[in-house]
Amino acid sequence: MTDCFVGIDTSNYTTSAAVCTAEGEILANLKMPLPVREGECGLRQSDAVFAHTKNLPSVMQKLPEVLRGNRVLAVGYSARPRPAADSYMPCFLAGIAAAQSFAAGAGGAPLFEFSHQEGHLMAAVYSSGAPENLLREPFAAFHVSGGTTDVLLAEPAGSGFSVTRIAGTEDLNAGQAIDRAG
């Protein structure tokens, strides 16, 4: 039996779930882009919530097969765009509900709340090949996603990050292009 972690994210562009082992091996990386009509700049939050509500069953139904014979140690989920008190988007409510339901069905696995931005930062840390170095001290990160194109100071804090915006633009286009490309 392998110990695993499950992650769920419902951003304004993609319904996502992932499974990784305690050693960091990715067993599943499931993504379903939300439909954005041609010529549109994005989705209204109500449309994103509706799309996630439609997508989540398809994504979540694939997890039991991936997890068969394994043990879920914890479930992490994105609850907001950034790790800030005033950061809120309704699209994350669908993922919160899915994560809470999944954790309850997985024997009451502990839940860990993160921001979407922290998910991007942690993905960059682990794909660097040297996460133990980056998780010891603050580092600068160039973050391009959805509504942001920023240079950030990321300081490891508990299981997430304390994030300070050093510089950035108000331009949505670069972040939208990255999110739509997946």
Task: Specify the residue positions occupied by each region the protein language model found.
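Short acidic/glycine-rich loops and adjacent helix/strand connectors
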Residues: 1-182
